[in-house]
Amino acid sequence: MKYKVEVLSNTIFATNSYLIIDNHNNALIVDPSFDPQAIEQKIDFLGLKVVGILITHSHQDHIFSVQYFMDLYRVDVWASEKSKELLGDRIRNLSFIGSEHFGLEETILDIPVKILEDETTYQIENFIFKAGIYPGHSIGCTIFDFGELMLTGDFIFKGTIGRIDWPGSNPEDMKNSLLLFKERYKEIDMPIFAGHNDATTIQKELKTNIFLLDPKNVKLL
């Protein structure tokens, strides 16, 4: 199946929210961020049926509109166990930054979540993807491998990786996650759509991203 990808970037932290669309106009929302109206307008314009919400990790700029779309479309939310833990933690989900520095309402969520396990394949309607859990930037960081495209959240970006100096970040976990990712995907290539910045590919990052070239010895901080 060929999936289509729509990216919507907000202006606060330049966070990318995504719509993954199948050939029947069903859609998954990935990391609904600070501009729910723009996302909703895109969904309406394209005539999409939302069938689920995926969370790569529970930092505020990736979960701000989860409750809004969960209530609007009456669909399940999918996240790792550790990401679920952070939904209601204003410090480790970084809501305190949004409220103290940008005047944003804090995002404190107590919602049912479908739990994702590492290296496990899931199906939502026609969507089939494998979840991979790679802590470091956040304890519950999850990538979504759709076979023909991948969403990495704030784990891996074009040319770099997610910050590891936030509350709940862990440099040693990040190093281990980079090693694991490199081993799992050393012979696989597909487009990567990250939580910030432009799209890239797995092999481009494995060959040029300094943090993936030699994860054992790279200086993270």
Regions found by a protein language model. Give the residues of each.
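Short acidic-hydrophobic surface loop/beta-edge motif
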Residues: L8, I20, D118-E125
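Short Gly/Pro-enriched turn/cap motifs at secondary-structure boundaries
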Residues: L8-N10, I111-K114, I133-P135
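Residue-level marker for buried hydrophobic side chains located in beta-strands
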Residues: L28-V30, L54, V77, L151, ...
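Active-site HxH/HxHxD metal-binding segment of metal-dependent hydrolases
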Residues: D35-T121, I210-N217
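Metallo-beta-lactamase
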Residues: N93-F96, I128-L220
